[in-house]
Amino acid sequence: MDTSKKDTTRSPSHSNSSSPSSSSLSSSSSKEKKRPKRLSSQNVNYDLKRRKIITSEGIERSFKNEHSNLAVEDNIPEEEPKELLEKDSKGNIIKLNEPSTISEDSKVSVTGLPLNKGPSEKIKRESLWNYRKNLGGQSNNSEMTLVPSKRFTQVPKNFQDLNRNDLKTFLTENMTEESNIRSTIGWNGDIINRTRDREPESDRDNKKLSNIRTKIILSTNATYDSKSKLFGQNSIKSTSNASEKIFRDKNNSTIDFENEDFCSACNQSGSFLCCDTCPKSFHFLCLDPPIDPNNLPKGDWHCNECKFKIFINNSMATLKKIESNFIKQNNNVKIFAKLLFNIDSHNPKQFQLPNYIKETFPAVKTGSRGQYSDENDKIPLTDRQLFNTSYGQSITKLDSYNPDTHIDSNSGKFLICYKCNQTRLGSWSHPENSRLIMTCDYCQTPWHLDCVPRASFKNLGSKWKCPLHSPTKVYKKIHHCQEDNSVNYKVWKKQRLINKKNQLYYEPLQKIGYQNNGNIQIIPTTSHTDYDFNQDFKITQIDENSIKYDFFDKIYKSKMVQKRKLFQFQESLIDKLVSNGSQNGNSEDNMVKDIASLIYFQVSNNDKSSNNKSASKSNNLRKLWDLKELTNVVVPNELDSIQFNDFSSDEIKHLLYLKKIIESKPKEELLKFLNIENPENQSE
């Protein structure tokens, strides 16, 4: 039995422990005190890989190094602390005393590493970092977030009780009350409170809504707005194309997502209140009612749409039931009951015109942020456009701020831009406010680079003409011009055709200020449309038929006016003859004959018995003149007293010729020729 004990005590590990390296260490201390022998070695760890054995030589070397360092430090004289700024008697700064450099022995309390060294390779390894895993249990780095360890996140249980006595919120509890100024009728006002009152307390405690989280998956074909954002920033187009998927988490684990960096109501940037359920963000003043940024709601905040989805639990039956109850309870506003019900279930949105109104005019368009813009608005150039060579410029960041270029060398005054009437000099603290300014090589008018239209952009290495000048020399073609001018005009026109191909020139047929008599030549426009209705309420060009109808309508009205005047003239003439006949005592038959002679057209029944081709035209109108009418106008009372004698054949021929001549002329010219006043003028 004794031999077995000896064998167990003399194990290989024990024999190794009494190696020469360890014996030298024990021999130095054996003179002072002898080491007692061990009777058993059952609870001793003999794994030498975890031990650090220090020899006697190593102890002596480390001891000498420590004493040598102390001796050197003792010999260094201590310097007196100096002030940071040394000043003379007048108060001027003479010297700046920089603080002493940090010693290599100083360490960071958090990492335990010196300040002059970077992190070690062990810290750089991602395998040693703490990650939060996703739902599937996978450890993809793209879907993980760094989470501190539990020893740093532990909070004492009585932490709130310790600091609760120091709070002073009880002083303002009686002063602050919830405002009812912006309260509106809706599903979240009366319906929710009434339904909660009807629920028993046991069901209310057991009812737990599952956390609804949102995951955004960006499509690969998302387009980015390069004009509004640069260098990979989030844009509205990229996030609007993202497909949202709402799902329920069975394990109650959270999935982090990034909220939008623009307001969902007005599409503008600024400070937001982010929804904890969906990625939407809102300005504090864009919400209905607005929220005070100093008194934000505690806990998780949800937008109106998410609140409504959580309340109805994504059930259409619940939605219809609540909507019907709301309509029954609000009979006084039955017409707008559905509208009032849907007001609180939608997020506030800035008013925008419909697309068919926005796209009516070709020069008007909607900006990147939904604002109004037309051809008069100048789009500012971005940094990528300014500092690249796409527009023939070679600008660098070093040229972005140079105060000398903003001052006129001759007068010493600031150069003021012709377009914006500003200098935009910038400052040393804010050089980004500076804008490059240049002067015209012909009129010395200053222009900012971003104020110049793109059609007149300056190219380095050549003289530049500002937009105030005409682009080319135009020769006016005059009819009565010399040969050299006409040749110059032809040469200029030929050069223009050579320089710019496929360019059409339209020469007007009439000059400016030409007075025409209403004879306007209109080129008909043919439209190849297969449908008659107007799509999207677009404004079309003026149709050719509308001009024709207006022209015919004006002619018809003018003809009616002429007929009305002629009728009034004849009516006044007949009235005058009737009055003269009644004064002279003529019978009614004579008066009828006198009046019949004044009719301009008379039905001729002479051709009824004729057998020629014109026999069918029995009721032809023929212009007749009666000299009795003229004599009655000239001498109204002497017509009956005239005695008619027999005339010879020659006199009758002359009278017939005279009658033909008189009948060939109209009445107005004949009365004017005979110097007889018009009866119409006499009536007036």
UniProtKB/Swiss-Prot annotation:
Biological process according to GO: negative regulation of antisense RNA transcription; negative regulation of transcription by RNA polymerase II; nucleosome assembly; positive regulation of transcription by RNA polymerase II; regulation of DNA-templated DNA replication initiation; regulation of transcription by RNA polymerase II; transcription elongation by RNA polymerase II
Classification via SMART domains: PHD
Main subcellular location of this protein, as a coarse class: nucleus
Signal sequence bounds: none
GO MF annotations in UniProt: zinc ion binding
Any one of the GO CC terms: histone deacetylase complex
Zinc finger boundaries on the chain: PHD-type: 260-309, 414-472
Superkingdom in the source lineage: Eukaryota
InterPro entries tied to this protein: Chromatin_regulatory_protein, Zinc_finger_PHD-type_CS, Znf_FYVE_PHD, Znf_PHD, Znf_PHD-finger, Znf_RING/FYVE/PHD
Nucleotide-binding listed as a keyword: no
Bias type Low complexity, positions: 10-29
Subunit structure: Component of the RPD3C(S) complex composed of at least EAF3, RCO1, RPD3, SIN3, and UME1.
Other known facts: Present with 486 molecules/cell in log phase SD medium.
Protein name as annotated: Transcriptional regulatory protein RCO1
Protein species of origin: Saccharomyces cerevisiae (strain ATCC 204508 / S288c)
